[in-house]
């Protein structure tokens, strides 16, 4: 069965793996999922990204981060904002600050996928893909 929303699938796989305290999770690779994973790594939510497989069957293997003695997940919540049935676009001034700047909004812009901070710095708006905190 075809996956019609790979971004939601990615967020769900990461959310489920981190709730179960898994070290890694596998996600079907695409340009968009690679870009989102790079932003998550730059923002410190995941520790490592590697690829496994070849061609159409390529998967991203994400190493999740945990903190403290009790291994609390670094990612507390992931919410999909713009969905296939209802796209959400914001200009530079309308970009959201997640939890007053403690979280990250991942934005798809004309200059690529980036965090809300980077989009403000670049002076571009775009499609708000998800919130992570």
Curated annotation (Swiss-Prot):
The keyword Ribonucleoprotein applies. InterPro entries: Ribosomal_uS8, Ribosomal_uS8_CS, Ribosomal_uS8_sf. It holds the Pfam family Ribosomal_S8. This is Small ribosomal subunit protein uS8. It comes from Parasynechococcus marenigrum (strain WH8102). One of its GO terms (molecular function) is rRNA binding. Keywords: Ribonucleoprotein, Ribosomal protein, RNA-binding, rRNA-binding. Part of the 30S ribosomal subunit. Contacts proteins S5 and S12.
């Amino acid at each position: 069965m075809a996956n019609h929303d790979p971004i939601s699938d990615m967020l769900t796989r990461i959310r489920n793996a981190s709730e179960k305290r898994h070290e890694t999770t596998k996600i079907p690779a695409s340009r968009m999922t690679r870009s989102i994973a790079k932003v998550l790594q730059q923002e410190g939510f995941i520790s490592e990204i590697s690829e496994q497989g070849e061609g159409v069957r390529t998967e991203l293997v994400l190493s999740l981060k945990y903190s403290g003695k009790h291994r609390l997940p670094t990612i507390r919540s992931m919410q999909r904002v713009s969905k296939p049935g209802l796209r959400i676009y914001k200009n530079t001034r309308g970009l959201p600050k997640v939890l007053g700047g403690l979280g990250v909004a991942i934005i798809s812009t004309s200059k690529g996928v980036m965090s809300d901070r980077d989009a403000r710095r670049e002076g571009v708006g775009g499609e708000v893909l998800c919130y992570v905190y």
